[in-house]
Regions:
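Short, histidine-centered active-site or binding-site loop motifs used for metal coordination
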Residues: 15, 100-102
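Short, charged/polar surface micro-motifs in flexible loops or helix N-caps
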Residues: 57-62, 68-69, 102-104, 145, ...
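N-terminal amphipathic, basic helical "cap/leader" segment at the start of enzyme domains
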Residues: 1-91
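A glycine-rich helix N-cap at a beta->alpha junction
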Residues: 75, 151-169
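Small-aliphatic-rich amphipathic alpha-helix that forms the alpha element of a beta-alpha
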Residues: 38, 102-150
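Short coil/turn connectors at secondary-structure junctions
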Residues: 91-94, 132, 155-159
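Active-site-flanking beta-strand signature of metal-NTP-handling nucleotidyl enzymes
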Residues: 95-99
Length: 169
């Protein structure tokens, strides 16, 4: 099998799935490896705009509560939507929030966001190669101040995706 054939098989085999073993943890070393792999995505002008924050265990609940608080502060969604948000990050054993450093130049900002999307694809392909299930979602708010702080992101950063990771169920 050629490298191209192996890559084609990997890319075609990647699926979006939240069917995961809820109690089987994803090791922090694996999450770190996936984030490092993600950082090999191309970025024009070497801006390296991606930001990663991972949540496991009780951290997922903190993420949900913090996002729901930001939603309430922004008067976004009703109580039912905020309540749903509080628990949604418990759907997978690991959650990676992926942020993007903005750029004042609109064209460079768009290029940065594209680079972060490419980084997420690298992360998803790496997860598939390791046998993990994955799901890329977009949060209700892309600039939630308390979530950005929880993630140790800059207040100006934007969230491009939330990636759920777990072992297939």
């Amino acid at each position: 099998m050629t490298t191209f054939d192996a890559f084609t098989q990997l890319a075609r085999g990647r699926r979006t799935s939240l069917v995961m073993e809820p109690d089987r943890a994803v090791d922090h070393d694996i999450i770190d490896q996936l984030c490092e792999l993600a950082s090999w995505a191309p970025s024009h002008k070497r801006t390296w705009p991606w930001r990663f924050a991972s949540f496991t265990g009780d951290g997922r609940s903190r993420l949900g509560t913090t996002m729901a608080t930001d939603m309430a502060d922004a008067d976004f969604g009703d109580d039912a939507k905020r309540t749903k948000t509080q628990g949604k990050y418990l759907r997978a054993p690991a959650v990676v929030v992926v942020g993007c450093e903005p750029h004042p130049n609109e064209m460079l900002h768009l290029e940065n966001r594209d680079a972060v999307a490419a980084a997420i694809q690298n992360l998803l392909l790496g997860a598939t190669a390791l046998g993990l299930a994955s799901f890329w979602s977009t949060p209700a708010l892309t600039r939630p101040p308390k979530v950005l702080d929880l993630c140790s992101f800059s207040p100006d950063d934007r969230i491009v995706g939330v990636v759920y990771l777990g072992w297939p169920g």
